[in-house]
């Protein structure tokens, strides 16, 4: 007996109130208890990775230690390249950047498990991260530069008559960073998963539509080979999107931290 399981079900959001009360009416939440639990588990994994990498002092490191050290060194390299080689800034902002990279990467990897939930495929998760980043960046700007922070919206040498227009344009551009950061991650993660789902469902439908054993083997084997290749590409995309998210976050921080140097 064939059980119809929709691979795109991982993109569905069920409210916490309907999960508890068994009713979809008068919903007070948009994120299910399962999704909250997964986000909590990801947070614990990030903390565990950071703790292990920080407390490892083995004379002969294991393979796991080497992977973690490479992970940490790579993120630290991104921070230094974008924000600067100043040791103080690197130590201040590295834990934040490392946490964001680890959270996004682990979320993407967990989404590669069939029928699992992919947090970064939901705009509510990525937009929450990006808005928090931009609020934090803005607060850092005010803390470091006080009122000079507003000079970010007025390029040097701007004619006085063009100041109001350029301030408006720069402010919109600055505010749009949060939305572009969130949409870029969500769109790229969702696209690959949707392609997986479409190919899987078409393969199952084609297999059920034919009666020949040979044709059934072809309709299953060929899409399966394509899915294996796509799976490898999606693993690369998961890493690449984590890197892009981290790189852009560092870039936004660098604009604020090094504002007085330009």
Swiss-Prot record:
Recorded superkingdom: Eukaryota
Annotated compartments: Mitochondrion inner membrane
Keyword Endoplasmic reticulum belongs to the record: no
Key words of the record: ATP synthesis, CF(0), Hydrogen ion transport, Ion transport, Membrane, Mitochondrion, Mitochondrion inner membrane, Transmembrane, Transmembrane helix, Transport
Signal peptide bounds: none
SUPFAM superfamilies for this protein: F1F0 ATP synthase subunit A
PROSITE patterns to which the protein is assigned, alphabetical: ATPASE_A (PS00449)
Record's bilayer topology term: Multi-pass membrane protein
GO cellular component: mitochondrial inner membrane; proton-transporting ATP synthase complex
Transmembrane portions of the chain: 30-50, 64-84, 91-111, 123-143, 149-169, 195-215, 220-240
GO molecular function: proton-transporting ATP synthase activity, rotational mechanism
InterPro entries in the cross-refs: ATP_synth_F0_asu, ATP_synth_F0_asu_AS, ATP_synth_F0_asu_bact/mt, F0_ATP_A_sf
Oligomer and partners: F-type ATPases have 2 components, CF(1) - the catalytic core - and CF(0) - the membrane proton channel. CF(1) has five subunits: alpha(3), beta(3), gamma(1), delta(1), epsilon(1). CF(0) has three main subunits: a, b and c.
Role according to the record: Mitochondrial membrane ATP synthase (F(1)F(0) ATP synthase or Complex V) produces ATP from ADP in the presence of a proton gradient across the membrane which is generated by electron transport complexes of the respiratory chain. F-type ATPases consist of two structural domains, F(1) - containing the extramembraneous catalytic core and F(0) - containing the membrane proton channel, linked together by a central stalk and a peripheral stalk. During catalysis, ATP synthesis in the catalytic domain of F(1) is coupled via a rotary mechanism of the central stalk subunits to proton translocation.
Similarity comment: Belongs to the ATPase A chain family.
Matches recorded under PANTHER family: ATP SYNTHASE SUBUNIT A (PTHR11410:SF0)
NCBIfam families from the UniProt entry: ATP_synt_6_or_A
Protein name in UniProt: ATP synthase subunit a
Taxonomic source organism: Allomyces arbusculus
Gene label: ATP6
């Amino acid at each position: 007996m064939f059980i119809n399981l929709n691979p795109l079900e991982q993109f569905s959001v069920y409210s916490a109130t309907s999960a508890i009360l068994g009713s979809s009416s008068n919903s007070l939440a948009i994120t299910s208890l399962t999704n909250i639990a997964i986000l909590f588990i990801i947070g614990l994994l990030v903390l565990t990775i950071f703790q292990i990498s920080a407390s490892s002092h083995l004379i002969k490191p294991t393979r796991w230690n080497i992977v973690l050290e490479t992970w940490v060194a790579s993120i630290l390299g991104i921070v230094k390249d974008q924000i600067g080689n100043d040791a103080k800034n690197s130590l201040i902002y590295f834990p934040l950047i490392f946490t964001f990279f680890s959270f996004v990467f682990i979320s993407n990897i967990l989404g590669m498990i069939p029928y699992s939930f992919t947090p970064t495929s939901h705009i509510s998760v990525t937009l929450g991260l990006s808005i928090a980043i931009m609020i934090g960046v803005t607060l850092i700007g005010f803390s470091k530069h006080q009122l000079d922070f507003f000079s970010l919206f007025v390029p040097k040498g701007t004619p006085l008559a063009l100041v109001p227009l350029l301030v408006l344009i720069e402010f919109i551009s600055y505010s749009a960073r949060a939305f572009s950061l969130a949409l870029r991650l969500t769109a790229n993660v969702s696209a690959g998963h949707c392609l997986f789902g479409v190919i899987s469902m078409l393969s199952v439908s084609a297999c059920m539509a034919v009666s020949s054993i040979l044709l059934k083997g072809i309709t299953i084997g060929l899409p399966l080979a394509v899915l294996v290749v796509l799976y490898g590409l999606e693993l690369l995309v998961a890493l690449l999107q984590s890197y892009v998210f981290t790189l852009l976050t560092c870039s936004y921080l660098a604009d604020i931290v090094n504002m007085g140097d330009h």
